[in-house]
């Protein structure tokens, strides 16, 4: 009996030890493997990169065909300041785009167009002064270029008020090379790419002062250029403008 008691006691000790070890092991084991626990990630929204705004004076041109916004170049200060002055004095309000030629340009700024009869030939009105030419080889007649109209004069001085915006067309490398020879010009690789892919009127480069460019509203130029017109290239339905400075 003593042997049995010792045997039972021994079994009890072994069982208790085993149970104690099992509980210790159970406490040390996590319900999920450590490798499955993912660290918390603080997801922040990607920062939007704002477009860089080029410094300069901007003019809003509201027309019957839509809105155009042009940037005036600081490289042509005489034209920039004169144009801004006329805009701020409301000179252009209610004037017409009196001459439009698809694949070339749209022209306006004739003061005689404000109250012109429907059959009146326009384009000779002015403000009584001209502006000295401000040519810069980096400013060219790409599509959307804003340039000053002028009469035929040796100094190539600009009209004090009439302007045009280029619609133009696309040119091949061969055509650009021919213009270079004809006009004695040089078209840089960047200009060639612009004239080939975007279009413009390269024949006018260094002949008429370019003093700005369209930032918004190229499609408006296309619409105006396609307007029905009479034999003087004047739109049959009046296309009026209102100009204001934006900055």
Give a label for each model feature.
Residues 1-25:
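Bacterial Sec-dependent N-terminal signal peptides
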Residues 20-247:
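Cyclophilin-like peptidyl-prolyl cis-trans isomerases
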């Amino acid at each position: 009996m003593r042997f049995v008691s010792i045997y039972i006691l021994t079994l009890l000790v072994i069982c208790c030890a085993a149970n104690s070890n099992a509980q210790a092991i159970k406490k040390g084991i996590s319900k999920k493997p450590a490798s499955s626990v993912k660290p918390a990630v603080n997801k922040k929204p990607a920062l939007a990169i704002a477009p860089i705004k080029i410094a300069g004076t901007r003019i809003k041109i509201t027309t019957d065909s839509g809105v155009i916004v042009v940037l005036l170049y600081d490289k042509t200060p005489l034209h920039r300041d004169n144009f801004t002055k006329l805009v701020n004095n409301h000179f252009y309000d209610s004037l017409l785009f009196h001459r439009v030629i698809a694949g070339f340009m749209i022209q306006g700024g004739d003061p005689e167009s404000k109250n012109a009869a429907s059959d009146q030939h326009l384009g000779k009105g002015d403000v009584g002064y001209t502006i000295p030419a401000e040519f810069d080889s980096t400013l060219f007649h790409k599509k959307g270029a804003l340039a000053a109209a002028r009469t035929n004069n040796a100094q190539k001085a600009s009209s004090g008020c009439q302007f045009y915006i280029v619609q133009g067309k696309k040119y091949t490398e061969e055509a650009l090379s021919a213009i270079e020879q004809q006009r004695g010009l040089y078209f840089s690789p960047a200009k060639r790419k612009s004239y080939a892919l975007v279009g413009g009127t390269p024949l006018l480069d260094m002949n008429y002062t370019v003093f700005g460019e369209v930032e918004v509203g190229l499609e408006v130029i296309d619409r105006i250029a396609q307007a029905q017109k009479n034999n003087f290239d004047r739109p049959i339905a009046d296309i009026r403008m209102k100009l204001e400075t934006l900055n």
